[in-house]
Design a protein with these regions (language model features):
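Structural motif
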Residues: 12, 72-73
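Hydrophobic, well-ordered beta-alpha structural blocks that scaffold small-molecule cofactor pockets
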Residues: 1-41, 45-48
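Conserved acidic residues
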Residues: 55-57
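Short amphipathic alpha-helix with an adjacent loop that forms part of the alpha/beta core around
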Residues: 59-69
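E1/E1-like adenylate-forming module used to activate ubiquitin-like modifiers
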Residues: 100-152
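ADP-ribose/adenylate-binding Rossmann-like module
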Residues: 73-80, 84-112
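An accessory alpha-helical subdomain
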Residues: 129-215
Length: 215
């Protein structure tokens, strides 16, 4: 599989199954998409802003539900393999993406894998092991969160810094070098623990005087 970011803004995701896995999938996609969760019962978990539809579809009902919701993605997250098979087949016939929550990495049972994800806007990190080592995905995600907890702040700082250096007439090569110095600086990362302003101050010190600065 090839990693790919997909914009679900304005689209619908149909989650079939209201257990803990279905709830987790609903929370993931509800950050952008309109999510419909179809299940005869729902786990005592948060489903974010998803619409919960209480129904017990049979495999023969998959066509009707996919046509009714017109999803960009179908998540098959029940413990009934026949039901998951039916929704997978119908979704593929309708050109929708498919994520099989009861399968790990086999494209014949779905063409989408939802990786372990870290979000610190505007930074998004996704980690996948093809279903072979979920514990490793979780470990790597937690390690990133611990070591780069200010990734979002760093991205904002560096983005503004690039614009500032460009406006000041600093040549492209020097701009790239300056940005590399900042993102590799332990001092800047540590300073961001005290907020954006402190991080900017230390970043300026790290960069120092740059050739081509016309200010």
């Amino acid at each position: 599989m090839i990693p790919l970011m997909h914009d679900f803004e304005g689209e619908t995701v149909l989650v079939v199954g209201g257990g803990p896995v279905g709830a987790r999938k609903a929370r993931t996609f509800a950050t952008e998409a309109s999510v419909v969760v179809l299940s005869p019962e729902f786990a005592d978990r948060a489903f974010a802003d998803a619409e919960k539809v209480r129904a017990a579809p049979d495999p023969e009902d998959a066509e009707e539900w996919v046509e009714r919701t017109d999803p960009a993605l179908v998540v098959a997250a029940t413990d009934d393999s026949a039901l998951n098979d039916a929704f997978t087949a119908v979704a593929e016939e309708h050109g929708a993406l498919v994520n099989r929550a009861d399968d790990h990495g086999d494209q014949s049972f779905g063409n989408v894998v939802v990786p372990a994800t870290v979000r610190d806007d505007p930074v998004t990190l996704a980690i996948a092991t093809g279903g072979r080592a979920p514990a490793l995905s979780k470990h790597l995600r937690e390690r990133f969160e611990d070591e780069f907890g200010n990734a979002g702040l760093m991205a904002e700082l560096v983005g503004d810094l690039r614009e500032d250096l460009r406006d000041r007439g600093v040549p492209p090569a020097e701009r790239r070098d300056a940005v590399r110095l900042v993102v590799r600086s332990r001092e800047v990362w540590k300073a961001l623990d005290s907020g954006r302003y402190k991080g900017e101050q230390v970043a300026r010190d790290v960069i120092g005087e740059l050739p081509g600065d016309q200010t």
